[in-house]
C-alpha cells in the first residue's frame, strides 16, 4: 500500500509512487533528468527506515563500480543522519554496521562473490584469479589456432567451403574474426550451446524461412508503397504542366509495373528483381521550361518525386530482392553445412577455451556470469536450491540502468527474485531511450517487453513513468519532444514516443527564451581548409558566440552569470575529428580538452616502435621493415631503398633484396656500410629478444637509439614521451600474464588494434578546470552541461557491419551470404538479406537513442551543428517535411546521418517558403506546449563566416605592445600587480634565451651582438611590434609579397627534377602545371613564379653537377646541440638546441655539398664588381652558412662544402668563406 503523499514533500506523484510501490515487480521508466538516482536512493532508505529491512537484505545492482560506490556512500550518509536524529534506534545502529556488508555493486561483483562462496559446486580451485586483458586475448587466439588446426587437418568438405568463403589466399584472418564474433554473441546468451545449435534451423526449416520471408516482404512493402506515393505525386504534377507527354508516358509504364509488382497486396519478387528503368528520363527541354515559365518549381518537384520513386524501388532491388524469393530460399539448404560447421567450431572454441582457463586457474568476466548462472540454475532451466536460498536472503532486488542488461544477466536476476511479475520483488529503473550499448550485447528488448506488459495499476507488473525533467529549460525539452515524436516509433526506434515518453518541464528556470539552434554550414570549395577543418572553425566560432553573448541562469539566486568555458561541451559520435577541433581552438586561444585516448596506435612514435618490434620478430614483412629503415632512427632515403629493390625486383621480400644488394659488385660502398650497420643492429635485437622479456627489448631500443630523447624534443614532446612509456608499461603488464615472447606481445597489440582499444597519455581534467570539453555521446551519459554543442551531424552512420559475409543477431541468429566456390562469386541468401535489414533497423534505432542522449544533456541551450557541400543537399530533406506527421518509415530507414532526420523535421519552420504541393497540414503554432519546437535554423556559408572573423579581428586586433601599455583605472589593483611583476628573477638571461633556436634566429642574435645591440632588446622589440600572419582562408586574394614569392620559389626548387640532358622551357612549364594538379602549389601561383630565373638555374653548372651526383637529399631538417657546433661557448653557458632546414644536399665522389637557395633582390651599385658583390652577399649569410656547415659536419662526420645560389646573381661557392 502506497502511503499518502504529504503536501510539503519535494517528490512528484510519480516519484512518490516509485519510492513506495511494492507487492509486484516494478519497472520505472525514468526519462532523462527525472531524478532516477535520487528516487532509487530514497527507495532504499525508506525500505530501511519505514519497512525496517536490513540493508544487507537488499541487492542493489548498478552498471559501473563508480555508480555503486557513489550510491553506497549516499545510502550510508542518510543512515548516519537518521541514526544521529534518533540515537536510541537500535535498528539504525545495526544498519551503520551492516552497510559495509551490503550488496550494492555491479552484477559482475555479485557473481564473483557467488563463485567465491560456492566454488565447490563448480569444481574449481578456490585460489582462482581474474585473467588480465592480455592473457584473455592471447589465450582465446591460441584456442582458435588449435581448433582451426584440427579442422584443417580433417579437411571436412563443409569446412573447406567455409574456409574458401571466409579466407583469402594469404590469410584466414577474416574467418578468425567471424569465429570471435560468434563466440562473443554466444556467451552473451544464457545457454551458449543451445543458441549455437539453433543457428542452423532457418537453413533447414521451411517454416523458419517463411518467417524470414514475411519479415523481408513487410519491409520491402514499406518502400514499394513509398515508391507508389512518389510516382503518383510525380504523375499529378506533370499532369498540371504543359508539354510533358513523354514524362507522363514513362510514368504510366512505371505505374503499370508497380500495379503488377504489388497485385493483390503480394509482392512479385521475380518481377521486381528483373525490372529495369529507362536509361534516361526525358529531360525538361527549353521548350517545356518556356511553356511552364511560372511553374518551374513544380517542374523540379515533379522530377524530384520521380527520382524518389526510382530510389525506393532500387532500394528494394538492391537490398531486399536482387534475386527472387525462390532463388533466395534455394541457397539456404546449400549453406546449412557451412553454418553447422561454424557453429561446431565455436562450440569447440568455447570448450577448449574453458579448459585452458581452468588449467591456468583463471576466470574472465564472461565466466563470472555463466558460473553464477550454473550455481543458480539447473540444466532444465529451474532454479537450484542455492538460488532458493538467495531468494529468501533478499527482500528486494533493485536494478539501475536496466535498459543495458543482457539476457545472461536477466536470467541471473530471474533465478534469485521471488514470485512472478504480479507479486515479485524486482525493482527496475532505466530509460530505454538511453539504451546505447548494443555493441556490448545490451538488449533493450528486455526493457521494451516489460514496458509493454506492465500496467500502471500493477495487475501485470507495475509500470511507472518518470517524465518530469529537472535539468533543462522548456525550449530544450519541447524541441526534443517535437523531434522524437516525428522520428521514433516501434518500427524505427523500437518504442513509441507518446505522451508517456515525453519530457515535461520541472526545473525553476525563468521565462527568458533559449531556442535550439540548428546551424548548418555550407562548405567553401575555394578554401584551403578541408570540410572538417571548416566545421571545426565554425564550432569554435559558436563557442566564442556563447562566451560573448550568452548567460547562465543560477537557480539558487534567480540571477544570471557570465558563462565559463567549463559550461560548454562538444558532443560527437566519436573522436575522429578531435585533432581539427584542437587546432581550431588553439588558433583562438580557447582552453580545450578531449577526454580520449583514441588514435594512440596511429601516433608516429608508437608506429615506429611497433614497426621495430614486428621487424625484429619477422623481417619478412616489407611494410614494417621499410618503415623502420625510412624512419628517423635509420634514415634510409627513398632513393636508397629504390636502388636496393631495383637490384632484385623479383624477390618476394625486401629483406631478400637487401641480401642481394650486399652481394652486388656495383653496390654503393656507403649504402653497403649503412645496410651492414642496420643488419648488425637487427641481429643484435633478435638475439636479445630470445633471452629477454619484451619490455627490456623496448627499453634497450629506447636507450640505444635515443628514441625518448628524440621525440621529447618534437612538438607535443610530453605527450609523445608518455605514449612511448605507455607502450613500455603495456609490455610489463603483458609479462605479468602467463604468456611470453615477442610474437605473443605483437599478437596482443594487434587484437587491441582490431578491437579499437587505445591506451595513451593520461591527461585527466577535473570537473572544475575551466576548459571546453569534447567527449563522445557515450561518455556524456549521466552528465549535464549548461551549453551543449552537438556536432558532426553530417557524419555518416557506420553501416560496415551490414556488408559482412556473416551477420549475427541474438533473436534471429545468423545470416550468411552464399558463396559459390566453383564460380568464385557471392550471392545474398534469404537469411543474409533478412538479417541485414533487421540489423539496419536496429542500428538506426540505436543512433536515434544516441541523439536523444546528446540532446538531453543540455540545461540552458542546445546548438546542433552539421555541414553540407552545397545548399541543394538540404532540398531532399525539405521535401520530406510535408506534414506534421511522423517521417516516413522508408525515409528513416535510408537516412545516412543525424542531420537528415533533424533537418527534415525542423525544416517545417520553412513551410511558408515551400512550393504549393509541400504545404503542411496544420500550423506549427497550434501544437501543445510540450511538443512545440522552439528552434532557429541557420544556414551559413563558410566563406561569409571566415570574412566575419576577418573583420572582427581587424576591429579587435591589438599588438603585444597595446596590451603591455594598457592603462588600468583600478590603481589599487594595478599596484598589487606591479608589486608582483617588479620581482627580479636572478636568472633572467636564461629565461629570455629559448631552449630551441632556429639557425635564422641565431644569425639575428649574433649580428645584433656584433653591432653592440642587446639581442634581448631586439627580440622584445620584434615581439611587441609584430602581428601574426592571418590564415589563408581568412585572406582576400592579394598580390603575393616578396617573402611569399620566396616560399613559392623554394617549393618549385624542392620538387625540381635533376636530369643531365637538362629541362626545356616547355618541360618546365609542364612540371609547374603538375605541381598545381597535385595541389603542391596554388592554382593562381603560376604568374608569380619567376620562370626565367628557374631556367637560368637549370642552365647553370651547379644544376648539371647536382644532376650528375651520386645522391640527392632535399629539404633536409636537422636538430643539433649548439655546443657541438659552436666551439666558442663557455662551459657555464646553458646549451640550446639548434634546428634548421637545408634546401638541398648532394654527394659526389664521396664529398658532401649543400645548397641554399636565395631569392634576395638587390641593386648592384656603380663601380662594384661582381666579385665584390659576391663577397658582400657571402658576408650577409656567413653566420647562417657556418651553422649549416658545422651541423652537417657534426652529423655526417665528414668535411662538407657549400653553395649559395642567388636567383638574381648566380652561384657562390662558400669554400673560401672564413669559418668563425
From Swiss-Prot:
Swiss-Prot/TrEMBL GO biological process terms: double-strand break repair via homologous recombination
Cofactors that this protein relies on: Mg(2+)
This enzyme's EC code(s): 3.1.-.-, 5.6.2.4
Coiled coil region boundaries: none
One Pfam family matching this protein: UvrD_C
Keywords associated with the record: ATP-binding, DNA damage, DNA repair, DNA-binding, Exonuclease, Helicase, Hydrolase, Isomerase, Nuclease, Nucleotide-binding
NCBIfam families tied to this protein: addA_Gpos
InterPro entries: AddA, DNA_helicase_UvrD-like_C, DNA_helicase_UvrD/REP, P-loop_NTPase, PDDEXK-like_dom_sf, PDDEXK_AddAB-type, Restrct_endonuc-II-like, UvrD-like_ATP-bd
Role, per record: The heterodimer acts as both an ATP-dependent DNA helicase and an ATP-dependent, dual-direction single-stranded exonuclease. Recognizes the chi site generating a DNA molecule suitable for the initiation of homologous recombination. The AddA nuclease domain is required for chi fragment generation; this subunit has the helicase and 3' -> 5' nuclease activities.
Keyword ATP-binding: yes
All copies of domain UvrD-like helicase ATP-binding, residue ranges: 9-473
Residues of the UvrD-like helicase C-terminal domain: 474-782
Protein name in the entry: ATP-dependent helicase/nuclease subunit A
Name of the encoding gene: addA
Quaternary structure annotation from Swiss-Prot or TrEMBL: Heterodimer of AddA and AddB/RexB.
Annotated positions binding ATP: 30-37
Family statement: Belongs to the helicase family. AddA subfamily.
Record-linked HAMAP family: AddA
Keyword DNA repair: yes
Organism of derivation: Staphylococcus carnosus (strain TM300)
Catalysed reaction equations from the record: Couples ATP hydrolysis with the unwinding of duplex DNA by translocating in the 3'-5' direction; ATP + H2O = ADP + phosphate + H(+)
GO cellular component terms listed in the entry, alphabetical order: cytosol; DNA helicase complex
GO molecular function, one term: 3'-5' exonuclease activity
